[in-house]
Amino acid sequence: MARVRTNTKLKPSKKADLQVVKPVKTTRYSDIDLNNWRAYDHVKTDTLWEFPTRLKEGGHSNEYHGNYIPQIAQQLYERFTKKNDVVLDLFFGSGTSGIEAINMGRRCIGVELKDELAESVSQKFTPKQLVTDVRIICADSASEEMREKVQASLDIMRE
């Protein structure tokens, strides 16, 4: 079960006059206010996520067979990460997870088995992002070598 912390900042409800003001309540892994979660219109809260179209802006394209729609990453990152957190994608592919991480103020470590795909996806990021916010590791996701490279990348990103 996730531990919950309560911020001391108070956030008024929609009817601020004479209404009870609840403290902002978040978890250690998300900035979503648990006392006000229904007010997040951009976060899908039902069990079926329907998106009218696939996002194509912000660096996304549909050139790789193993990709998924960026809105899935958006929904997951909104719920389970905070700004500046590091997202680990062990099957980086076309970089959808990394692009969305950057677009949402997160950082990303992507592991990709194919050299040519890792090189191609690195072109989607700026040289500065590849130093500070995105690490692309070419390795087998099940290997000890990958674990060591991910740990080294995490150490660098924490500095």
Question: What residue ranges belong to the model's regions?
Answer:
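Class I S-adenosyl-L-methionine-dependent methyltransferase catalytic core
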Residues: 2-159
